[in-house]
Design a protein with these regions (language model features):
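Glycine-rich phosphate-binding loops of nucleotide-dependent enzymes
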Residues: 1-201
Length: 201
């Protein structure tokens, strides 16, 4: 996502080899990362968190001011599109559930032009219902044409929404597999280090 330079390999974006010097470079190329901590401010409103420094303005020149009405309308509409009813967009984000906050962060990234979403453990701290809401939105985002990279240790969340899987073990790739070639049980065994355990027996 631009924070670290790769030790090896290449990053190809739309057929061109690309080097990111910062997260801003990645964002400019349409690659957005939603981190596990979400980068949300609990005491700020839903709208303020949605725009976070990119608020719509009204007026001219030095007399520009934050267009609160437009911002509230956009935030409510975008959240509504994913099935989350924000009755009052001025409410503090801290009053929302974990799943709603996760969807807010993802919806924000998409609104600002993300072509590829990198999601870092988006369901790790969520209950069953909240996790299902987030996973449904991930499927919806992927179906709309976005590229989605879901980073998770939970095979029960990864398998239903994934098309291909890259398995990492201690920082090394164990391979990339298409869903049609890999059962849920096989994926679970590889993630749990099952193949290494088999070699010890």
């Amino acid at each position: 996502s631009g924070v670290h330079k790769p030790d090896e390999g290449e990053i190809i974006v739309e057929g061109k080899k690309t080097v990111f010097d910062s997260p801003r470079d990645a964002l400019d190329m349409g690659i957005a990362t939603v981190y596990q901590d979400l980068a949300l401010v609990s005491l700020m409103s839903v709208t303020r968190n949605f725009f976070m420094g990119r608020e719509p303005m009204k007026g001219f020149g030095p007399f520009k001011t934050f267009d609160v009405k437009k911002a509230n309308s956009i935030a409510s509409e975008r959240m509504g599109q994913i099935g989350i009813d924000v009755r009052d967009p001025s409410q503090a984000v801290g009053t929302m559930s974990g799943g709603e906050r996760q969807c807010l962060a993802i919806s924000r990234a998409i609104y600002f032009g993300a072509k590829v979403l990198i999601l870092d453990e988006p369901t790790s701290a969520l209950g069953v219902h909240q996790a299902s809401v987030v996973l449904k939105y991930i499927v919806k985002a992927a179906s709309s044409g976005l590229g989605v990279i879901l980073i998770t240790h939970n095979v029960h969340h990864a398998y239903p929404v994934g098309n291909s899987f890259t398995i990492l073990n201690r920082g090394k790739s164990m391979g990339t597999f298409n869903k049609k070639d890999l059962s849920r049980e096989k994926l679970l065994g590889m993630m749990a280090g099952g193949e290494e355990l088999d070699k010890l027996e």
